[in-house]
Amino acid sequence: MGEPGFFVTGDRAGGRSWCLRRVGMSAGWLLLEDGCEVTVGRGFGVTYQLVSKICPLMISRNHCVLKQNPEGQWTIMDNKSLNGVWLNRARLEPLSVYSIHQGDYIQLGVPLENKENAEYEYEVTEEDWETIYPCLSPKNDQVIEKNKELRTKRKFSLDELAGPGAEGPSNLKSKINKVSCESGQSVKSQGKGEVSSTPSENLDPKLTVLEPSKKTTGAPIYLGFPKVTEVHHEQTASNSSASQRGLQMFKVTMSRILRLKIQMQEKHEAVMNVKKQTQKGNSKKIVQMEQELLDLQSQLCAEQAQQQARVEQLEKTFQEEEQHLQDLEIAQGEEDLRQQLAQALQEHWALMEELNRSKKDFEAIIQAKNKELEQTKEEKEKVQAQKEEVLSHMNDVLENELQCIICSEYFIEAVTLNCAHSFCSYCINEWMKRKIECPICRKDIKSKTYSLVLDNCINKMVNNLSSEVKERRIVLIRERKVKRLF
């Protein structure tokens, strides 16, 4: 969760603040600072970065925005997220602002299969600062800053291995070279019969390296790094042990240099004292002491040269370890990317399978509907054919049985004679003006009977015929009515 201590400020401590309390958890709370816009998502430019461990794509890059309106009321807006923002179990419209109040329930994303609740569920609350800040989630910029500090700490040097106040390898190398030069100058001056004074300040700065912190070992090098494979752990452990051995050799050599320095200073003081006491006395003893001083200086130079070589070797080892750690970081990052890509591909294939299943279901439904449509069409065609057949048969019946033999039209006001033959009322009346006999059987006409049933039947059958036939019949009826009047 990170250390929330950086949230505590002088004016805020002891007050009350609004926050989104993570439901069922005492960590991962989101602080709503007055006057600040709070963005939530899985991208890098948001206030709080939420990366789902179960479904990385559940939270969008910039999922939602929380800010205060001019009245100071906190509001929430869905920033066109893929899986949506839910306020009190109701999904919010994208880019629409909604007010939130104490106790409101906020859900980011949707629950996965076989799960009742979503991964990120919050409750709007206002609590005391002392209650809130131990549970707060670190902001995205603070997480990035902390990661930068961790990467900086990994690039340790001799300065860190030697403890606080120690000097780096480059400074140590230059100062050892300086000591070597000063020692060589002292040897040259003594070869001329002069013993120059060597102040203790010339070598004191190098002595700070002799007090490395016991905590500075190879182990802390790997703090803050992600877990890698066992092979990486073994390689790291071997490199760490090599660094520890090199550090121990470095400390031992510096201790020798310190002892030689002290012996050389004591010998130098002894030579000076002897010279003062016996300026022209025992020159043999002075020469002997100067020779011993030269031997000590030569030994010191040799130790310093060895120390220089060890420093270079240690620097090389540290550089190799640093490069190795960087390679491990790159490999781990690539592995994480491969895992994310594999998971994304798996989700993609699952979605494609679901789409294929849906496609097959839709195709089956469409085929069934097409089959039903074809059957309906066939039935309709059959009904139409039957209807046409009935109409054709009806036309035949009308033409053969219900036509007047005089006018060759369908009966209009049908009249049946005593001989059982039927004619139009107008037609038989006109016929009887010339002859009083049946036009068909030539029997005398004794009676005429109007057939209303036959008229109604003919009218209903004509209604099912074409419009031309119906119009022609109407015209004939009108003409005959007019002729009757005259």
From Swiss-Prot:
Pfam families: FHA, zf-C3HC4_3. CDD domains: FHA_RNF8 (cd22663), RING-HC_RNF8 (cd16535). A zinc finger (RING-type) spans 404-442. PROSITE patterns: FHA_DOMAIN (PS50006), ZF_RING_1 (PS00518), ZF_RING_2 (PS50089). Autoubiquitinated through 'Lys-48' and 'Lys-63' of ubiquitin. 'Lys-63' polyubiquitination is mediated by UBE2N. 'Lys-29'-type polyubiquitination is also observed, but it doesn't require its own functional RING-type zinc finger. Its main location: nucleus. It is an enzyme of class 2 (transferase). Residues 180-201 have a biased composition (Polar residues). It catalyses: S-ubiquitinyl-[E2 ubiquitin-conjugating enzyme]-L-cysteine + [acceptor protein]-L-lysine = [E2 ubiquitin-conjugating enzyme]-L-cysteine + N(6)-ubiquitinyl-[acceptor protein]-L-lysine. Residues 38-92 form the FHA domain. It is found in: Nucleus; Cytoplasm; Midbody; Chromosome, Telomere. SUPFAM superfamilies: RING/U-box, SMAD/FHA domain. Pathway: Protein modification; protein ubiquitination. The modification Phosphoserine is found at residue 157. GO terms for molecular function: chromatin binding; histone binding; protein homodimerization activity; ubiquitin binding; ubiquitin protein ligase activity; zinc ion binding. SMART domains: FHA (SM00240), RING (SM00184). Its EC number is 2.3.2.27. PANTHER family: E3 UBIQUITIN-PROTEIN LIGASE RNF8 (PTHR15067:SF4). E3 ubiquitin-protein ligase that plays a key role in DNA damage signaling via 2 distinct roles: by mediating the 'Lys-63'-linked ubiquitination of histones H2A and H2AX and promoting the recruitment of DNA repair proteins at double-strand breaks (DSBs) sites, and by catalyzing 'Lys-48'-linked ubiquitination to remove target proteins from DNA damage sites. Belongs to the RNF8 family. The FHA domain specifically recognizes and binds ATM-phosphorylated MDC1 and phosphorylated HERC2. This domain is also required for proper recruitment to DNA damage sites after UV irradiation, ionizing radiation, or treatment with an alkylating agent. This is E3 ubiquitin-protein ligase RNF8. It comes from Pongo abelii (Sumatran orangutan).
